[in-house]
Amino acid sequence: MSYDELELDTLGDRKTALFLIMSDTDDTFNFVISILQSQLFNLLCDKADDEYNGKLPVHVRFLLDEFANIGQIPRFDKLIATIRSREMSASIILQSQSQLKAIYKDAAEIILDNADSTLFLGGREIGRAHV
């Protein structure tokens, strides 16, 4: 690859869909998705601040299915609290909130606190059923 095929820096300029697909049976390269997500959040925050007075012209929505299987995104607890003002949002999709706690430890509660809404589709976590 001799040139940038992803053009991540154009996200937020126009409507675009980017699909990051990983194996659900082999986690060898999950760290690549985690690094890419981290870089993407940072790139778009910087772009919003530097080029668009703090807000991207086109809202960027991250649909993070199987979020626990991506691995830990560095500083995600801080990012999730600040991206909203820059016209970005993240939908974190988990099988159970315990997965989030296993990966993010104490920061899991901060991540949950910064979620505007929670959709619970059933499960056996009795403690979360009372939310």
Residue ranges: model-predicted function:
Residues 1-88, 103:
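P-loop NTPase motor domains
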Residues 80-128:
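Conserved ATP-driven motor cores of ASCE-family P-loop NTPases powering translocation/secretion/packaging/pilus
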